[in-house]
């Protein structure tokens, strides 16, 4: 719920309504499953908390002490602090983004439109628009736990978390 409050506050004081967009990121350690690996878009930002890159990491596992690790394509294991900001695709876009995304989508279709399994990933499109200086995305950070069902075994925890939020009057 705090993610929506963060977005509402940011929209209320948006310094560049045509160009500035928002993304709520979550602390990586608060997005992991204890039942297996996950993939997360790890966000890189500048000193002003503006998004500079979303790097997709796969095969992320929790590690002791709130840390994490991922394995790259060649099998090398890399440590993560757990403090990294993960994109869970909680975006706050101004309407102007859709003209920009439309142009990128046309480029995508001309390059990969005939591939059966090609996908137009919003985080990659946003990174590309940012690199082209068409938009800026301010990263807002939520310290809430993010929960979802990545594995069947996650379901009871998610159900309990939702019940707890309802019982606590949060939802």
Regions found by a protein language model. Give the residues of each.
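A generic structural signal for short hydrophobic patches within well-formed alpha-helices
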Residues: 93, 97-98, 155
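A C-terminal functional module that forms or caps the active site or interfaces directly
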Residues: 102-134
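Residues that scaffold the ATP/ADP-binding catalytic core of kinase and kinase-like folds
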Residues: 54, 100-101, 158
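Structural signal for hydrophobic packing residues in well-ordered secondary-structure cores
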Residues: 11, 15, 101, 105, ...
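Residues that recognize and position ribonucleotide moieties
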Residues: 90-91, 119, 148
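Hydrophobic helical membrane-anchoring modules
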Residues: 131-139, 143-171
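Conserved core of the sugar-phosphate nucleotidyltransferase
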Residues: 2-91, 95
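Residue-level signal for well-ordered alpha-helical positions
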Residues: 35, 57, 103-104, 161
